[in-house]
């Protein structure tokens, strides 16, 4: 369990699980060649992300705007978590039919467009909680045989499940 919830307090909100679950695909290639020194290998990694640099700047600005709007910096941890969770579930709609306009798996879709699938919900929730120093992780799994992701959050030494996708609109 300790390894599953390992947490690095020094990471900013855009690192850690946010970075891990914000890539679209990784292509790995290995090339072998030979020169006068002998055989060599060249490893090439191509990483594509769910959002562009410009979109991430917009997400960062929106995260700061949301936290300022919620005015929770002086609140206790439970109130902070509840208010952030209520914001996400009340302002993001589940929509998997909008693939042509933007990537519904991204925090950008959730924060800026207000429509996302579970990954977008979880990425936005992760960013908001992480930004104010609340330990949380993203958990991949499945729901009824379909891929799903949700968050866990640490409070008073215990970890709790948060699934903003299933609570949207509440």
Segments (PLM) and residue ranges:
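Short, structured interface segments
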Residues: 39-53
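Short, well-ordered strand-loop elements centered on a beta-strand within folded domains, enriched
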Residues: 41-45, 106-109, 113, 158-164
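Secondary-structure boundary elements
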Residues: 53-110
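Hydrophobic/aromatic-rich core segments of domains that either
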Residues: 120-170
């Amino acid at each position: 369990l300790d390894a599953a919830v390992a947490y690095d307090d020094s990471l900013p909100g855009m690192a850690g699980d946010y970075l891990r679950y914000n890539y679209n695909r990784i292509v790995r290639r290995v090339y072998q060649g030979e020169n006068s020194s002998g055989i060599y290998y060249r490893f090439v990694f191509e990483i594509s992300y769910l959002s562009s640099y410009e979109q991430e700047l917009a997400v960062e600005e929106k995260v700061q705007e949301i936290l300022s709007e919620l005015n929770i910096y002086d609140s206790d941890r439970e109130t902070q978590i509840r208010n952030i969770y209520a914001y996400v579930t009340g302002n993001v709609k589940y929509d998997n039919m909008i693939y042509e306009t933007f990537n519904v798996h991204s925090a950008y879709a959730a924060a800026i467009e207000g429509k996302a699938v579970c990954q977008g919900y979880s990425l936005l929730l992760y960013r908001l909680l992480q930004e104010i120093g609340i330990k949380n992780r993203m958990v991949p799994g499945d729901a009824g045989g379909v891929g799903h992701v949700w968050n866990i959050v640490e409070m008073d030494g215990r970890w709790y499940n948060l699934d903003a996708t299933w609570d949207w609109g509440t």
